Structure formats: structure tokens, C-alpha cells
């Protein structure tokens, strides 16, 4: 009898509903291809000061002036999916602690090369990089908050999950 290993995804979002919809949509697409998934949501705007620039948030996390361990234990995480400016330093910090992969939706505004994948809308016209995935439109349809089958296939191929 084959025992399936649980795949653990941490979603990091800011206070915007659109950010939550995008990370949940991508997690749902991954869930279709993996049977046993554990999903946890972390709200970055409740953990870090949102008015600070990303580099400063990241630095404060590194030197333990912002302590997220009390709010979140570094359990076994296979993947982090984050969206929103303030979520990106938290995503990188936790990635370093757990040695997992991470995907950021939209521009993280700093340390772009340290993200495994960054999902960017094609209309934003960023300079191409190996870790960028360009998409047309949003990950999820705002009307029904579901990801299309075409996008599920697209992400499965691009993310190698």
C-alpha cells in the first residue's frame, strides 16, 4: 500500500482581497494535481509594518526585530505562494528558514532573482528573466474566483509541480 506524502503550501497575503483570490486560485490549481495538500494562510499586514520599504522589512526580519516565529512555526513547508508588496520580504525570509520553493504573484519590488518564480502580467512589460512567468490577465476570474483549466495546465507545466 502506497502512502502519499502530504504536500504543504504556505500562502502569504496582504490585506487586499485580490491578493487572497490570486494565491488561493493558484493553490487550488496545484491541489488538483496533488492529492494530499495542507494549506496555511499567513497575513503579512498583521505581522510586519506595511509602511516600511521591503528591504527594511526584510532586514528587520533577519535581525529578529520583527519576530514572526511566535505567530508561525517553521514546520515542513514545500511551497510558499505570496502576493502583494509587503508579503515578498516575509516570503523570502521564511523560504530561507525552511529551504522550500517560493512563487510570488506580481512584482516583489526587491531581490527578484531570489524568488523561484514570479508571476507577472504581460502588460506590465518587465525585463525578461528566467524566473518570470508572464500571464495574460489574472490567475483567477474575479466573477467566480476559479482558475480556468487552460491556466491549470499552463501553471502545471511552467511550475514543474
Predicted regions and their residues:
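N-terminal pre-catalytic "stem/leader" segment of glycosyltransferase-like enzymes
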Residues: 1-65
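Glycosyltransferases and closely related glycan-assembly transferases
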Residues: 23, 31, 75-79, 89-103
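Short His-centered aromatic/hydrophobic patch
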Residues: 83-85
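Membrane-proximal helix-turn-helix segments that form the acceptor-binding/catalytic region
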Residues: 70, 104-116
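A nucleotide-sugar donor-handling region in carbohydrate enzymes
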Residues: 113-161
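Short, well-structured alpha-helical segments in soluble
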Residues: 61-76
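Short beta-strand/turn micro-motifs composed of small residues
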Residues: 12-13, 106, 120-122
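Structural motif
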Residues: 8, 78-79, 117
Amino acid at each position: 500500500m502506497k502512502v502519499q506524502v502530504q504536500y504543504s503550501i504556505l500562502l502569504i497575503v496582504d490585506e487586499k482581497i485580490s491578493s487572497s483570490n490570486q494565491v488561493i486560485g493558484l493553490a487550488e490549481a496545484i491541489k488538483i494535481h496533488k492529492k494530499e495538500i495542507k494549506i496555511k494562510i499567513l497575513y503579512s499586514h498583521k505581522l510586519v509594518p506595511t509602511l516600511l520599504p521591503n528591504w527594511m522589512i526584510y532586514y528587520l526580519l533577519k535581525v529578529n526585530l520583527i519576530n514572526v516565529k511566535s505567530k508561525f512555526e517553521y514546520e515542513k513547508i514545500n511551497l510558499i505562494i505570496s502576493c502583494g508588496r509587503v508579503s515578498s520580504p516575509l516570503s523570502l525570509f521564511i523560504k530561507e528558514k525552511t529551504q522550500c520553493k517560493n512563487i510570488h504573484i506580481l512584482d516583489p519590488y526587491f531581490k527578484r532573482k531570489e524568488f523561484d518564480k514570479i508571476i507577472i502580467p504581460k502588460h506590465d512589460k518587465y525585463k525578461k528573466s528566467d524566473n518570470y512567468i508572464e500571464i495574460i490577465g489574472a490567475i483567477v476570474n474575479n466573477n467566480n474566483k476559479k482558475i480556468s483549466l487552460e491556466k491549470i495546465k499552463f501553471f502545471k507545466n511552467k511550475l514543474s509541480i
